[in-house]
């Protein structure tokens, strides 16, 4: 596999390789897109500005549908706990709980860092050129191509593609430089982990923050995850400390 054309610029400079797709961001969305495009026979390059999976970007509490996106043998490595329901609270953990549950598992808790790495590995095995430690510094949309200025430890290069997929998160450079509208709202989130194991099969949801919620997720031998998200301007740190202090 490889780019479909390369050559020499009229002024003697090197013409960058032309890919069908350049993917910016190799989280779950970017890795999945890169894999599907590569499997369909397209030439794909995917850039991750750091190391895939770090820093942790989101909770590991996911739908059981996730197993349709990874190899069959990945479940044993990724699965940390099975969830059968949730307890909703209008206050802290000492307030009344309103449980919702089923007799079969409704969601799973996984190793989120390893999920990202597994999905990126699938994209690589499908033929995508996955590059870590590559930061896209500029996106220049031309008539029939997109030119990306990409920096890495060896310097800066220009990569050309027919299309770019912006999978670079809530503060997306691709979105901003392409003139696409900003999200109506961004949330400020915080996560923390207690290493003490917890095999409970219910998550706790606290409706104590504006426009979103706080949570406690048992992760089996991996411990307990606490999290909270709220609009900017909300005292997220203070609210989060109250949550974790209440759980002791």
Regions found by a protein language model. Give the residues of each.
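A conserved beta-strand/loop capping segment in the N-terminal third of enzymes
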Residues: 61-118, 125
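Extreme N-terminal starter segment of soluble prokaryotic enzymes
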Residues: 17-21
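Conserved dinucleotide-binding and phosphotransfer motif residues
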Residues: 40-42, 122, 126
